[in-house]
Swiss-Prot record:
Stated family: Belongs to the eukaryotic ribosomal protein eL31 family.
Protein's organism: Caenorhabditis elegans
Official protein name in the record: Large ribosomal subunit protein eL31
One function term, GO molecular function aspect: structural constituent of ribosome
InterPro entries given in the database record: Ribosomal_eL31, Ribosomal_eL31_CS, Ribosomal_eL31_dom_sf
Keyword Ribonucleoprotein: yes
Keywords attached to this entry: Ribonucleoprotein, Ribosomal protein
GO cellular component terms, A-Z: cytosolic large ribosomal subunit
SUPFAM superfamilies: Ribosomal protein L31e
GO biological process annotation, one example: cytoplasmic translation
Length: 122
């Protein structure tokens, strides 16, 4: 077999990036008991962010947490628009180099929205 002449490209996992997603929470917490719906919704958002951004360290912003809990523990909003930011960890002694910050994006109508790469404000 002939050797490959292609160069290895740089991994995109190590880059700092920001994206916006719509998460359909209603489908993810279907069948969960009424007193565990809001905590499970937070867990599902963290799981979604972990898969999409490929980081183990996921942090949820307080505004997103308050939006999920705004209608109580039982009546979680059906959908939420979130901004996932993969960032560099400032701690020198941390195990992971990168973490993901989940922030809330206010949205009234979810129709026609797609996943969007956002230019970094930093």
């Amino acid at each position: 077999m002939a050797p490959k002449n292609e160069k290895k490209s740089r991994s995109t996992i190590n880059e700092v990036v920001t994206r916006e997603y719509t998460i359909h929470i209603h489908a993810r917490i279907r069948g969960i008991g009424s007193k565990k719906r809001a905590p499970r919704a937070i867990d599902e958002i963290k799981k979604f962010a972990k898969i999409q951004m490929k980081t183990n360290d996921v942090r949820v912003d307080t505004k997103l947490n308050k939006f999920i809990w705004s209608k109580g523990i039982k009546n979680v909003p059906y959908r939420v628009r979130v901004r996932l930011s993969r960032r560099r960890n400032e701690d020198e002694d941390s195990a992971q180099k990168l973490y993901t910050l989940c922030t809330y994006v206010p949205c009234t109508n979810f129709h026609g929205l797609t996943n969007v790469n956002v230019d970094s404000e930093e």
